[in-house]
Every structure is written in structure tokens, then in C-alpha cells.
Amino acid sequence: EKTVTENADGTYDRKLTVKGKVNSESSKAPLDVIYVLDRSGSMAYPMDHDSQNSWENNGERRTAASQAINSMTNTLAANENLDVRFALVTFSGNKSDYRPGGYRDEAWNDAEIAVNWTNQASVITNRTSPKSDGGTNYQAGIRSAEGLLNGKRQNAKTAVIFVSDGDPTFRYRSDGY
């Protein structure tokens, strides 16, 4: 409704009345992000060398990978238009090692879910600098990420970010182990 009233001094007052409902619903877009991070031995190598024992060290590959993941995580978490959740899978492998508990390192345990779904960026950024050791079992990392997809939100867009420095060196046998 709009009204105009003339005042005694020759000026006018204009009144505008607006009616509507108050909406308190959030319109944040849901996003689920899974990072799949290589923690094989070569991730400890300098960025431009194929050996950990090079003369020149311009930063480790794992440091660059961690910084990239942490930067992306913090940027996404700070976006007020997103309702974002994160998960982190790490993978490597070394067929000759025995792990705690007496388990032999086999393809089936070459990956771990380091962080299950969380909306806390700091949980991810505190876990992206794992030790680097063993071979590169892409398959184990991808299978673990696939398992996390079962826990994703149905209404969320999903991104799987795969971070590695090289070709796979281990894989599952034909029987799945």
C-alpha cells in the first residue's frame, strides 16, 4: 500500500507498506568432498627429482599435496554459500611389511579412511601430512573412496579429488585381495 499526505508547510510525506513472510531457511548448496591422498614413499621425494637423496631439495611432494588439499579445504569451508563435508582416504603399500597387530601388508589393507565424513575443516588439515612409505596402490585408495560414497548425502553434489605423484606400483589380485 502506498499513500502520499500533504503537510501544512507544503511538503509531502510518502508512506509505503510492504507485507510478506519471513523466510529463515538456509539455501546453502550441499557438497561432499572426498580426498584420496597418495602416501607412498615417492611422496617424500623433492618435487623435481626421482630420489629422496638428491642434492637439491625444492620441497617434498607430500608437502605440496598437503598444502593443496588444505588450501582447497579452507576455501570451501569459508564459502558461506556451501554446506560442505569432507572425508580423507590415504593409500600406499609395501608387500614385505608387517603392520601392527601382526597383519601382513596386502593389497586389501593398502588404504585407510583417515577421516570419515566431517564438516570441520581442521580435522582434514590436521591429517594431510601422513608419513610416506611403500608403493602406490591406486586401486585400494579408489575402493576406499567408493565405500565412502555410500555415506554421502543424497542431495549433495560430490567431488572425489585424487592426489598422487606417479603411476601405480601395486594392485589387487584377480581374486580381489
Task: Describe the function of each predicted region.
Residues 46-50, 167-177:
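Internal, charge-rich low-complexity segments
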